[in-house]
Amino acid sequence: MSKFLITFLFFCVMNSTAKPVQVNTTSPWWKGIAFYQIYMPSFQDSDGNGISDFKGMTSRLDYLQSLGIKGIWLTPFLTSPKVDNGYDVADYYQIDPVYGSMDDFNRFLEEAHKRGIKVIMDMVLNHTSTDCKWFKESRKSRDNPYRDYYIWKDQPNNWESFFGGGAWKYDSITNQYYLHKFDVRMADLNWTNPAVVNEIKKVLRFWLDKGIDGFRFDVINFLHTDDVTTDNPIKAGKQQHLYDINQHGIQKAISIIKSTVSEYPDRFTVGEVGSDQIEVLTQYQSPQLLDVVFNFNFGSIQAFSVERLFNELQSMEKNMPSYPTLFFGSHDNPRLMNRLANGNIQRAKALAALILTAKGVPFIYYGEEIGMQNITANTFDEIEDIQGKTFYQLARTAGKSPDEALADGNKNSRDKSRSPMQWDDSSNAGFTTGKPWIKINDNYRDINVRKELQDKSSLLYTYKSLLILRNKEKTLQYGSYEKLEKKNDMILFTRTFKKEKISIIINFGNEQSVRLPEGAKILMGNNLLRPNEFLIYKIVGR
């Protein structure tokens, strides 16, 4: 194995010419913590129905606290027919019974707060379920008071649903079409109607009064605030979503949302913006709009590339107006271990070091810390995701064989990353005593929390060590970049806060020997970096 001696003198303060803006000690709490995303059906079941619930999740708060998690993002848990696992809300004021009662939620929130853990909830404001009372009233007649809560037209344009097929559904009761940018059972709200805006304000205040610490707003740049008549252009036989997203007026809608949330002190807003283009993301991030956007700079990378990782990191630093979000996995993406780590535990550790030491707000997807992997459906009946089911059915309609359709369904299904949390090697991975709502990965006996807690060389132990370090070091929470560079297959950066500097070297290439500057204190790693190893060291008061 080759060695290459590098002296990182550019990290030394004496050679520094940069004058970074310092962050004061009153920085918002969300800048200093790492979030953990819990996909509601898949974390911990307490009653044997095969679906996670608040009682089960409460029983796992000690685990999250010991891991070093300071924030939790909950995917939707409101009453829903679950066409899209809760992203189709039927009642904004009720807990879905499969997750427990309002008392169960209140206790979960209380116990999380006792452990110093903030909780934000997913809020879907682009559409509701067609089971929602508002929609049921809306479709009764053209002059119903709820009619204009949704978008109804005599003739549809050419817009396509993001789940496949057309975006308009004919309703024979009133002889008009309603808009659904996603599934036909998820009708888009009309944000040009002041009554809708007032309803949303009431919903937000209800949950803020409950003590929720903030919201993650789903597909926030999809809100209908303008034109629904102009056709989308077609390029190379594929529709370009030009006029159905990022409409004029969305910023005003978001400013109303933000002003409502701001009535309550110290609350956090993050929006999912369906784009990986920085110029689109930055339109929605400001003190008057969203605190941060859930940007897909890392999440959109489909194959491992040091060059791409560095370019995205550099792009976020140069172009984002404030803190970016840092994440690799989510309920919409394939698992990190499959997509970028390619089954390599050491690379997964290096990628963890990247998002937990870089500038930004990190989000860890449940199970990522133990290296959970994708699942694949073996039959159509094993597909749970509406998107996967739709693409299967479209393939069959187009004349493809069942096997070809299953391949299409699996390719487009988001089930890959939604399998139950793997707690131990007991039946059903310790997730449930009943039949799980979705298949459990067959590798749970080898990949689980209990096993990795007993192994100091495990991926879980690395995540825990990194989180403890991040929680301790203000520089890793609030520090600005002094240096951000790539050398061969290494990503190197220094973050600075007040008089302190912490340097990070992540080696994705061949073995490297590092000569540290005088007075450097190693926080993690060592100065002989093998492939996929990292080094974190501090320089104080120089």
Cite the ranges covered by each PLM segment.
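Sec-dependent N-terminal signal peptides
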Residues: 4-12
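Loop/helix patches that line or flank the sugar-binding groove of alpha-linked glycan CAZymes
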Residues: 242, 261-264, 268, 284, ...
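C-terminal beta-strand-rich structural cap/linker in extracellular carbohydrate-active enzymes
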Residues: 526-542
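Acidic/aromatic-lined carbohydrate-recognition and catalytic surfaces
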Residues: 21-205, 209, 222-275, 421
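Core domains of carbohydrate- and sulfate-ester-processing enzymes
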Residues: 136-176, 301-317, 397-441
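Active-site clefts of carbohydrate-active enzymes
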Residues: 233-241, 323-342
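Substrate-binding cleft/loops of secretory-pathway carbohydrate-active enzymes
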Residues: 129-139, 262, 268-302, 372-386
